[in-house]
Amino acid sequence: MLSWIFWILLSITLHELAHGWAAIWEGDYTPIETGHMSGNPLVHMGGFSLIVFALIGFAWGMMPVRPWNFRHRRWGDAIVSVAGPAMNLLIAFVTLTSLGIWLGLDSTMLQHGQPAWKEHVSNFLQLGGFLNLVLFAINLLPVPPLDGSRILSAFSSTLRGWYQHPNAGMAGMVLFFLLLTTNAFDWVVLLLGTFAVRYTAAIASIF
């Protein structure tokens, strides 16, 4: 439970900070002006997200930006949007690589089991890597208000107009929760889990 809380809070914070860093690079200093370039996860999550986190153990964050300040009018929003999932992917690779090295340096852990404290370390790293792979995939879904919708809108004015509809965000969230409750996302989770295991094993084999 504590590991889950740690990884959720860290992943959300770094995800949102990545959006902020990209926005600043694009010429928008709103993240600094609003005090959101902070390592405090409470700054990014907000009240409703915290309530949902307390109830079901999942949450989300927000980084305020002003797209009209971006240097690249068409691609700026896509650049800022892709920065968040890219951060999740980076966390996943760093964590899974660390897990592979951890296991590879002590091959007896794979053959004869692990002492309790070593198993805790392995589980901790495994959770962080897998969770961030899932967050990467979820955020790339082309469903507003997820990052994937903003990335895709850069390639199509028609999609951009639809995504900017006042009800698009609500419709997108309903569709997103339907995907989760109907297990339509399960095959993606299975694919990511398989990748995580094989990647970790490949790293471990080097050592």
Region annotations inferred by a language model:
Residues 1-207:
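Hydrophobic transmembrane alpha-helices and their immediate loop junctions
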